[in-house]
């Protein structure tokens, strides 16, 4: 399919009223999920678990509609409550929360919304320009190159897993081991399947694994804490100044356009490198702004609006840019992208060269859906912030059972099997212990999703190429060098981000807790 033809097809799909409603509905769910800390990824998992039964075009629009606004509404708890809405909004607290205490919450939120919109739009446009070029490049690759890229992708994600490299590698190995259970695709024989458990012949269900590893542990955390996220302020106090100064904040974004540009560029560059993403970019951009902006060393941490603009410009750009390696190479950069990769596989798409050659119209549908969702989300936040902000005060007694019921229904309907529910409980307990003891969960999901893909490329490679040919192919050598450079640079960025977070947390007294009440810092890619 030609590029112009794909653009027209993508626009034609988006022009359908059902698709527009899907984007709008996804945006509303995304805004609500982002406004409540720890529920962004579970919310996406719930929606995606239900969307796989829809028409693929509608399902993609719904998922992308939800993906974009999450990175905007997670600013609400960061600014109003001093609690990070997600891993990518931690640095926003440092100046956003002091602004709220000074009666400038609306100004901080207005700046954050526009900065996030700019970042999301720029990254979406970048996808539109990069994917046609990527199609030409990946078509010169063969099985050895994709095998190497897949292995390197898993390794990079594991290496930068919150400083726990060994745990990350072990988690990725567990994920690939789980993916190996079932029927051998080459021989057609059972593999690691007890005779008494024929359920496992089809392998472990992706939806079950994702819900059990990510979604249920977060809901269990809310239930065990047995309180709303915000306990030190009332809803009335939190939203009192939420509508004041929004337009002033947006004007400040335009005044600091060079800061926005630098932050967006940094966000995009971080986004296209697997494994770091949202867990790093907010601290890097905040530290960069603090070091380069005039007077920032003295004013950051006291309510300087530039300290809100910098990380918010970058996080949405990073989230969208992470779709580039996910769609072009089939290598997810973090937890969110691993879920999206699994989602595309369940819809019958195969991210990678085949996807770019056969489904370029879907690529442009993704681009247009992201653009529309960013606009929808920003407009709704500008006028409905006070309603979304109240979500953070919902009691777990009300919220958790509802989400839990939806998750269980989604798990059961995936195959209409009670075995799925039983296995879900086992995986959820395992996921809860990973969360509790600080084991990174994204590498496990990425290993699980990439396991069958790597196995397929490995089989083809061993049949068609000798070990020496695999290593000495020019394309392979280039990929190995680039992958090693990315791994080194990713680890370096992760260390710098950790150092920046520690330095800023100890040198800037914001009066807020450094840690989220959830495990937001653990999850990357959001």
Regions found by a protein language model. Give the residues of each.
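Re-entrant/interfacial helical elements at transmembrane boundaries that shape
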Residues: 41-51, 78-98, 129, 172-173, ...
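Transmembrane alpha-helix interface/packing and boundary motifs in multi-pass membrane proteins
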Residues: 27-41, 70-82, 157-162, 264-276, ...
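Membrane-interface alpha-helices at helix entry/exit sites of multi-pass transporters
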Residues: 57-61, 98-115, 294-307, 335-338, ...
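N-terminal alpha-helical transmembrane segments of multi-pass membrane transport
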Residues: 1-61, 102-111, 116, 120-129, ...
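Membrane-embedded alpha-helical modules
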Residues: 110-227, 346-498
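A structural-propensity feature for long, helix-poor, extended segments
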Residues: 69-79, 86, 304-329, 333, ...
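Helix-loop-helix hairpins and the membrane-proximal interhelical loops
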Residues: 1-57, 135-139, 193-304, 389, ...
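Short helix-coil transition sites and intra-membrane helix breaks within transmembrane domains
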Residues: 32-42, 79-90, 122-126, 270-283, ...
């Amino acid at each position: 399919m030609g590029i112009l033809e794909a653009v027209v097809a993508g626009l034609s799909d988006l022009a359908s009223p059902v698709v527009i409603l899907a984007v709008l509905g996804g945006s509303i769910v995304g805004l609500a999920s982002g406004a409540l800390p720890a529920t962004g990824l579970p919310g996406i998992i719930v929606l995606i678990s239900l969307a796989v039964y829809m028409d693929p075009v509608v399902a993609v629009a719904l998922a992308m509609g939800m993906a974009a606004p999450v990175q905007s509404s997670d600013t609400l708890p960061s600014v109003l409550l001093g609690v990070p809405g997600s891993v990518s909004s931690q640095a926003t607290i440092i100046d956003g929360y002091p602004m709220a205490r000074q009666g400038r919450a609306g100004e901080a939120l207005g700046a954050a919304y526009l900065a996030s919109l700019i970042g999301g739009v720029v990254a979406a446009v970048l996808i539109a320009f990069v994917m046609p070029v990527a199609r030409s490049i990946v078509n010169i690759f063969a099985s050895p190159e994709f095998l190497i890229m897949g292995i390197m992708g898993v390794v990079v994600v594991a290496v930068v897993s919150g400083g726990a490299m060994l745990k990350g590698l072990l988690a990725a190995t567990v994920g690939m081991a789980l993916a190996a259970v079932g029927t051998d695709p080459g021989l057609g024989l059972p593999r690691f399947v007890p005779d008494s458990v024929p359920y496992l012949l089809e392998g472990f269900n992706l939806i079950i694994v994702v819900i059990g590893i990510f979604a249920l542990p977060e809901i269990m955390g809310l239930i065990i804490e047995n309180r709303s996220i915000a306990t030190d302020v009332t809803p009335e106090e939190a939203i009192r100044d939420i509508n004041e100064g929004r337009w002033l904040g947006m004007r400040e974004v335009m005044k600091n356009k060079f800061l926005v540009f630098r932050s967006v560029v940094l966000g995009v560059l971080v986004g296209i490198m697997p494994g770091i993403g949202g867990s790093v970019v907010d601290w890097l951009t905040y530290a960069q702004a603090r070091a380069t902006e005039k007077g920032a060393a003295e004013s950051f941490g006291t309510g300087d609006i530039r300290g809100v603009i910098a990380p918010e410009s970058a996080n949405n750009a990073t989230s969208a840019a992470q779709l580039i390696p996910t769609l072009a190479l089939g290598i997810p950069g973090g937890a969110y992208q691993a879920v999206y990769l699994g989602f595309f596989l369940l819809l019958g798409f195969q991210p990678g060269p085949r996807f770019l050659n056969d489904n370029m119209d879907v690529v442009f549908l993704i681009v247009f859906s992201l653009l529309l969702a960013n606009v929808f989300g920003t407009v709704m936040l500008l006028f409905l912030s006070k309603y979304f902000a109240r979500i953070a005060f919902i009691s777990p007694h009300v919220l958790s059972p509802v989400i839990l019921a939806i998750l269980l229904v989604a798990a059961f309907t995936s195959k209409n099997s009670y075995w799925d529910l039983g296995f879900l409980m086992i995986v959820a307990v395992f996921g809860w212990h990973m969360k509790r003891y600080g084991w990174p969960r994204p590498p496990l999901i990425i290993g699980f999703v990439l396991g069958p893909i790597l196995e397929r490329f490995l089989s083809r490679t061993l049949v068609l190429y000798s070990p020496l040919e695999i290593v000495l192919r020019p394309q392979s050598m280039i990929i190995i060098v680039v992958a090693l450079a990315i791994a080194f640079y990713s680890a370096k960025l992760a260390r710098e981000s950790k150092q920046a977070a520690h330095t800023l947390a100890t040198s800037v007294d914001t009066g807020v807790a450094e840690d989220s009440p959830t495990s937001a810092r653990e999850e990357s890619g959001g």
